[in-house]
Curated annotation (Swiss-Prot):
UniProt KW keywords: ATP-binding, Cell cycle, Cell division, Cell shape, Cell wall biogenesis/degradation, Cytoplasm, Ligase, Nucleotide-binding, Peptidoglycan synthesis
NCBIfam families: murC
Name of the featured protein: UDP-N-acetylmuramate--L-alanine ligase
Source superkingdom: Bacteria
Record localization: Cytoplasm
SUPFAM superfamilies in UniProt: MurCD N-terminal domain, MurD-like peptide ligases, catalytic domain, MurD-like peptide ligases, peptide-binding domain
Entry EC no(s): 6.3.2.8
Function field: Cell wall formation.
Gene name linked to the record: murC
Entry's Gene Ontology BP terms: cell division; cell wall organization; peptidoglycan biosynthetic process; regulation of cell shape
Cellular component GO terms held in the UniProt record: cytoplasm
Major localization class: cytoplasm
Alphabetized GO MF terms: ATP binding; UDP-N-acetylmuramate-L-alanine ligase activity
Amino acid sequence: MFKRYQHIHFVGIGGIGMSGIAELLLNLGYRVSGSDLKETEITRRLSAMGAAVHLGHRAEHVLGADVVVLSSAISDDNPENRAAREMGKVPVIRRAEMLAELMRLKYSVLVAGAHGKTTTTSMVSTVLARGGLDPTVVIGGKLNAWGTNAKLGNGDFMVAEADESDGTFLLLPPTIAVVTNIDLEHLDFYRDLAHIQETFLQFINKIPFYGQAVLCLEDENIQSILPRVEKRFTTYGFSSQADFQARDVRTSGLFSSYRVHSHGDELGEIEIRIPGRHNVLNSLAAVAVARELDLDWANIQDGLRDMTGVQRRFQIKGEAANVLVIDDYGHHPSEIRAVLQTLADCYPDRRRIVVFQPHRYTRTRALMEQFARCFYHSDVLLVTEIYAASETPIPGVTGERLSQEIASHGHHDLHFCETVESALSRLVKLVKPGDAVITLGAGNIWQVGEWLLAKLKSSGGSGGTGELK
């Protein structure tokens, strides 16, 4: 690849996207170092693999590095970023540029979209692996079956998420480009929906003449750009107008099945062990990719049936005292609606308690109205203060303000809890046997579910009022 650059330093190495690239480079024999603000399961794993991981950001950490890779969360005044640039001869690049370099000698399957990227990437990866293509994979979440978010394969294909959040996905070279949906998101970078659509269109039109776009026809924002797509594309969805159609969708608990039709032919049945109509669409995207690559139908079926999910995507954390605890990464109104609909479909007889941690001030401000109307499938809602994710607070944009907006739109059992600790305290008093509790958000809200399970197990259950013994 780049033989002069043997020591690669990652600023923000603990991020899920950065860590996957770091793991691939370690497996390729490169010397990897990095820094992050705190020790996590991810940083411990990388350290065990041989990476030199530093806690905190200091200028001396970049000494000796041949190239420095920055997470999208790293600002210009970060001490390691500044030090590397002052050194002059050390390239300082963004994550997407390093990912693009890893893809340079591969055929790439890139999965883009506002929602569903991680699950769809995981499904495509699992199907390609089942089909014997042995892909190299970088996913934005830990695949349950593999225990990691990255895998170095020996095949000709690389499967990865294309993160649109800062526009750097335009640096990536797609051979096959999947777009799951386009939504109003990342308004700290994009001006408006038209800007987002235009950027996705540029991404799709980067496909070479021998490539293919795989586009979800259910999404209105994708439909509106189809006339301007210049490259070969196929569509998928529930509609009879889609090239790949999911028909006769059936759900049973956490399982879904459907029949695939394409261009007048019935291809067969697909079963997935991940609930939700949105995941039917995600799996259908994987079917379309696999058919483009001429994989056997049996391998497609087996690969999707074998797929057991991704951490933090409707992840069943456990059950204690007849209280079911689930965690999900959903932090956008569209994602929250889909997840809570799935929760209601899977557990119609349970009271549904949602613990939501808003993520980023800019997102909360831009989508306040949409957030106020996306929690109707919750019986009880706890909202914490906003998880900043390195952003500076915006006056008047708070978790309490969001709670007031949700209440004004008709939610009658809502509790504002300033911290995750206070959310746990309130939850302990509210929870009753038979409840389903789901934690939602891209920050550290998942801890509340784990703490709740530990308390329920240690206390031996809950009393009639819902209080722990």
